[in-house]
Amino acid sequence: MAGLLLTGCDDDDDNNSTADIDVGSGDTGVLNFAFALEQLEAAFYERVKGGDYYKGLMANSAEKQILDDIALHEKAHVEFFRTVLGTAAIKNLEPNFDAINFNDRANVLLNAQTFEDLGVAAYNGAGRFIQTAPNLAIAGKIVSVEARHAALIRDIRQYNSFVAADVVDLFTPAQGATAPGNGNGTGLERSKTPQEVLTTANQFLKAGSRLSANNLR
């Protein structure tokens, strides 16, 4: 993970009344954008552990182990970005999870899927703004882990649903096709712009912690 490069920093408030923190531009902006989302995910899984759903899981159950592993991964991602960004890092964010029922399995897993799918789409959409190869490489490594999280959560919710049209441009072979690649769809994960991502993410952040990515374009 060594060798990451940072360029530019802007964590000043912008003129958008619904956002309090702008992530910045260039590589620093992308890394702060990722740092913010990882903070949100890590905070979510920490809260999950305090709810009746998690507390009711058998200690050796696969479901509990999956949640524990994901929580550890997200914490590691947060600390990684905090270290890499140093003084360029945005502040610690305050989440707002009032709309989530942490005692209810279905609600927890639905929101876990929201966060994981959002994280994958965010990395895929922001990658084009990364200007240096080392930063692009580490983003690729982290998004691959986030995609594994998303697939696991989807499969817990509904078996064999880890790939679906809402997150992947599914490839459908053409009727009667005999050659590979003859059909519709790319088979690639879908992406979202930073602005699209923050429309969702800001719903889970308190006033004073909401984000803008006006300089990631």
Where are the regions that the model predicts?
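All-alpha RGS (Regulator of G-protein Signaling) helical domain and cognate RGS-like helical scaffolds
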Residues: 11-217
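C-terminal motif of bacterial Sec signal peptides marking the signal peptidase cleavage site
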Residues: 4-8
